[in-house]
Amino acid sequence: MLVSFEGLDGSGKTTQVERLRASLQADGREVVTAREPGGTELGEQIRALVLHGGEMTPWAEALLYAAARAELVAEVIEPALARGADVLLDRYFDSSVVYQGIGRGLGRDEVLQLNLLAVGGLVPDRTFVLAIAADRSLERVGSRPDRIEREDAAFHERVAAGYEELAALFPERVVVLDGSLDPDALAERIQGELQRVG
């Protein structure tokens, strides 16, 4: 099973990945987790460049994310799925669709196609979008902003709206949940939703 978690920075994705990992492991399942960008040596180098490096064009940013993602799929995700492990991702290609495609104005469909090529068409069984208001995201990030988080409020509003658009486009796999819920309640809703997946 491949599950991705999406949402604005500070929405609680990492917390929910860890809670789901613990729950699945308690059931005796092998679980692999990864963050994006990252998860491989090359991916971590790209992460440092895109989040903490200098300015770059929107297409350069999108292509770097896609390169990191291609490496993660080949080195980590596909081997884990092949041996029957569950894979939980703290971001996946939907992040690029909303951040670069919609937030940066490169085009939702263009960035989606780029990323589907990069991942060889590997789509999650379920994607959870943890929705929080853009101003709440910026509050939670606080004093640790990276290059993306330093964007203006209008950018973050476009990204938040982009996640809603994504859910409408792919209702069979994208589930939007209230990221302001208590983490325990949110974890229960996620586990309940995954029981329908298998």
Locations of regions flagged by a protein language model:
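Conserved lysine of the Walker
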Residues: K13
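Pre-Walker A (Motif I) flank of P-loop NTPase domains
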Residues: M1-L2
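NTP-dependent small-molecule kinase module
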Residues: R21, D135-G198
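Hydrophobic anchor at the beta1->P-loop junction of P-loop NTPases
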Residues: F5
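Hydrophobic positions on the alpha1 helix immediately C-terminal to the Walker A/P-loop
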Residues: Q16
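ATP-dependent small-molecule kinase phosphotransfer cores
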Residues: R29-V119, R189, E193
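A glycine- and Lys/Arg-enriched "phosphate-lid" helix/loop adjacent to the NTP-binding pocket
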Residues: R91, S96-A161
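P-loop (Walker A) phosphate-binding loop of NTP-binding proteins
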Residues: L8
